[in-house]
């Protein structure tokens, strides 16, 4: 897993 993918894999809890 590259760093770019890791950055894109953020866990943001926000209501849809």
Curated annotation (Swiss-Prot):
Pfam families: His_leader (PF08047). Keywords: Amino-acid biosynthesis, Histidine biosynthesis, Leader peptide. InterPro entries: His_leader. The keyword rRNA-binding does not apply. GO terms for biological process: L-histidine biosynthetic process. Belongs to the HisL family. This protein is involved in the attenuation mechanism for the control of the expression of the his operon structural genes. The gene is hisL. This is his operon leader peptide.
